[in-house]
A protein has these predicted regions:
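Glycan-recognition and catalytic cores of secretory/periplasmic carbohydrate-active enzymes
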Residues: 18-410
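Short linear sequence elements within intrinsically disordered, low-complexity coil regions
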Residues: 8-10, 170
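N-terminal signal peptide c-region/cleavage motif recognized by signal peptidases
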Residues: 12-16
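Sec-dependent signal peptide recognition
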Residues: 1-8
Length: 410
């Protein structure tokens, strides 16, 4: 869920510094949002019962999942065992999406849905007995003991609240944010001070021995950076202090100066290997990006410089040249004609993989835009990768970026 800063970049990406490059215009971005993404999220089936209780599982055409007759795109071995779960993080992410839609277009229906989603999270998915938010429910009941919930789940429960607060400074949402952040940093802070724990008790396939990058990173990305500057004192000072501590933890424990990347986890040598989970360019670029933005917020020039250099190095490593003729079938006729016989820049998730997921592509694009707003160095790449995301990854029939989005592969 790192799209929040994209909304701040869009207003400036297509102006003076990029005037000599054929990048998407403001109208192109609005078309991407209103015609490419919004239809999937504004259809009635997305609103939930009651509105704000957004459904976790919907098919590509927007229909709510029937577990007895699942659509092909959801009938996968890694998804189907969890059809009985309603995930808090999914509801929060959807509330966030409505906030972004309003932020870019002024759509009042989207703002109302963002509010309903935020209020549903607060009113129904907080654990009033133990603190925090439930990770998922089954038949309306919490699915795990509170100590088995991941700190990442606790962070993502706040994504939608953070965006709605960014737009409105709603006092009810403000208090929920302050309470939840305090809960996370009290309960999950490791006794050795090496960051936030993943879980506090083994369960649901997770272990308290795990030390995960995203336990740290997604606090920063999910809510701290967006809302810390808006909070009243003393909460603002406390959040900035925790943000500073967490960023330093990430740099001290998860970054490899030798390999110039972030480890996805550090509890065993195997999880630090380049092909292990979360050891991809997406997580590394996001960690550098968050370090850069944190440096700006806290006026730490060392972090700003470190994050900027890290982004530039990672973007270079993540880019490869793709023969367009091999992938042109994925593109609309406009781009098939415009890029015929060319070799185009593309993003990959790991060295020499020539593959990327939609979220990895988006994060690399966002970092590339950030870099180019400073020195213009990525604009030649962005004139290809931005239209590729809009054209290849978006479902042009029903809207949204779904599980059947196709990567550019050789």
């Amino acid at each position: 869920m790192s799209f929040k800063y994209l909304t701040l970049l869009l207003a400036t990406t297509s102006v003076n510094s990029f005037a000599d490059v054929d990048l998407p215009s403001g109208d192109d971005w609005l078309n991407h949002v209103t015609n490419g993404l919004a239809p999937y999220w504004l259809m009635e089936s997305a609103h939930g019962q009651p509105a704000g209780n957004f459904p976790t599982f919907r098919c590509d055409n927007g229909v709510i999942l029937d577990p007895q007759k699942p659509c092909e795109e959801l009938n996968k071995g890694w998804i189907s065992p969890h059809f009985d779960r309603e995930y808090t993080r999914m509801k929060s992410r959807q509330a966030y999406a409505y906030g972004v839609l309003f932020h870019l277009t002024g759509d009042k229906q989207a703002l109302e849905l963002a509010k309903k989603g935020a209020y549903y999270l607060i009113d129904h998915l907080q654990d009033e007995k133990n603190g925090g938010f439930v990770s998922f429910t089954r038949s309306g009941k919490p699915g795990m003991e509170w100590q088995q919930r991941t700190s990442q789940d606790q962070a993502y429960a706040l994504v939608g609240l953070a965006m709605y607060y960014y737009l409105t400074q709603d006092p009810k949402v403000e208090q929920a944010l302050i309470d939840q952040q305090a809960f996370i940093f009290k309960q999950y802070r490791r006794s050795d001070d090496r960051g936030l724990a993943w879980v506090l008790k083994d369960g649901d396939g997770e272990s308290e021995k795990q030390q995960e990058l995203v336990a740290q990173l997604d606090q920063i990305n999910g809510y701290l950076l967006l809302t810390a500057p808006l909070l009243p004192e003393p909460a603002q000072a406390k959040w900035k202090q925790d943000l500073e501590w967490l960023t330093q933890v990430m740099l001290d424990n998860y970054h490899s100066d030798k390999e110039q990347r972030f480890y996805g986890a550090i509890h065993h040598k195997a999880v630090m290997m380049p092909d292990a989970k979360h050891n991809d360019f997406g997580h590394t670029i996001k960690a550098y990006w968050m370090t850069y933005l944190t440096g700006q917020l806290l006026e730490n020039s060392n972090w700003t410089e470190f994050g900027f250099k890290g982004m530039k190095h990672t973007l270079k490593q993540a880019q490869y040249q793709q023969n367009f003729e091999q992938v042109k079938a994925l593109f609309s006729p406009e781009w098939q004609s415009k890029w015929a016989q060319e070799s185009i820049p593309a993003w990959q998730s790991r060295p020499y993989k020539h593959y990327s997921s939609s979220w990895e592509w988006a994060e690399l694009d966002q970092a590339a835009m950030t870099v180019s707003l400073v020195d213009g160095s990525m604009k030649e790449t962005l004139q290809y990768t931005l239209p590729t995301f809009m054209d290849v990854w978006v479902d042009h029939q029903y809207g949204g970026v779904g599980p059947k989005a196709q990567p550019t592969v050789s």
